[in-house]
Amino acid sequence: MSQRLSQLDALPKLKNISIGNTIGQGSFAVVKVGQLIKNPQRLVAIKYIHRRISNKKGVSDEKIGLELQIHKACTGHPNIIGLHMFGTDNTWIYIIMELAESGDLFDKIEPGVGIDETLAHFYFKQLVNAVDYIHSKGVAHRDIKPENILIDAEGNLKLADFGLATVYKRTNKEKRLSHDKCGSPPYMAPEIVSSQGYDATMSDVWACGVVLFVLMCGQIPWQEPSYGVDADFTNYVDFDGKLNESPWNVFDSTFKAFLRSVLKPDVSTRLTLQAIRLHPWVNHENVFMNSDNQCKDAEQLSEQLLSNLQVGLSDEDIHDTIKATQDYKKLNQKYQKFISNSQPAQDMAVLIDDIDEQRQRAVPATQDQLLFKNNKLPSYNLEDDQERILAIVSKDPANLQFVSPQLRVSQLTSTQRRLADFKRLPFSRAERLTKFYSILPIVSLVSILRDALHRIGVSTSGSIDHLSNDDLMELSTVNIGINILGEKSKMPLKGTIKVNQCDCSLQLYKISFVKSKGDPLEWRQFFKKVTILSREAVYIE
């Protein structure tokens, strides 16, 4: 985006709703948490779409209107994000939706590892139920992928984003084939790439199968389903899916046979949704699932889900990261010859948040907003500061990923107890786990981040290199724009590394890796690389 901050229009005020943190962003839209004033316990997600900018990028008001109509028709299932209402003014389209309070599902899955089969079964079954419901409404999603799979406060899956959805069948009428080639290449069915028309319901089935594969092993099976072009997909087709190399060799035979039945390149032999629901691998009880196919033990599920997350900061981890990063560095350097990384990645959310942050310095994270005259801040002794830093950091579940697996269970139980009060704070929901804390001075912190990014081939010339040390010391927030490629998919990854002062009276910073475009697993992999290479900046409880 080329819009300057001074040109950005203010967000419309919504009656009876207070606006909170940004939880999603893009080139012409931003998603924020909203709190009902008359019912403070009720939180919603509010998506703001800038009409002029979206129109300029080829997304018309009419197209957005069609998406909203389809989404409204599909609202009503417990595993689909509900659409409450929407409206518009001369500048913005605003959409009030159900808030998936626990954020991205795939933000909580370790790349290259995945989750255990019981959890994968739980989420796959909920995904199939959601897709079956929208198909019953005559709608095909056509963009099932990790970016569009969220989870609520109880750990249940929520299918989101109907931007590419299509009405494939109206009441009592025959199916209509789709002809436009849309979706994310790793999750697209082969018939989308190769045919003149395809059954969008069966391409949804294929995408569900790829999602299941990723749940089980934490990586995509191929970059795109093009025979003779993609080596991994070609190998899969040549051997009829009967592969013995990693990660296929870690799956048991029953699961592998089921997955191959879902991922049949020939549509006529691929399992339908109805057949999938009746398959023995799917149609059995799950310890996390109640009779309504929803989560019955959120605490146990969250403990299990987070158990594989790990960011190692040992010398060996640094050595392995540097060794594994050489090819990735070349990939990024080559990619950035074709795109301009000389300007910040000014997603809509960054622009809006920058305006707010220019109006006031960071406020304490543990209390209501305070105003200090003449920048005279209250002073605390070192012991008090350490206790207050610990109080802030220890409440964040993201810190568990830096704890060794041996201490994970006891730490998790302790953290869950301390979360009781924290969860009652407004706008603390839907935060990502791709973040760490630091108690280093801002100048040292930014220098370490810059060096880490350079080591994996990411330019910072347009985001922070122009800032002097004096400039940095005056800032409570620093945004580092990111525009790179995913290591496995070779698809664009865009976002922002946001360095925020947690409390204006403490030298404590939260470094958040906020994705605006791309695969959540590959974004987490990027977060891990930068964090490991920034080891000396990471504060661990």
Q: Locations of the language-model features?
A:
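Protein kinase glycine-rich loop
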Residues: 20-27, 31
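Conserved N-lobe beta3->alphaC-helix segment of eukaryotic protein kinase catalytic domains
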Residues: 43, 48-74
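Activation-segment/catalytic-loop signature of the eukaryotic protein kinase fold
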Residues: 86
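Conserved short submotifs of the Hanks-type protein kinase catalytic core
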Residues: 90-104, 108
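Terminal C-lobe "cap" of eukaryotic-type protein kinase domains
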Residues: 265-289
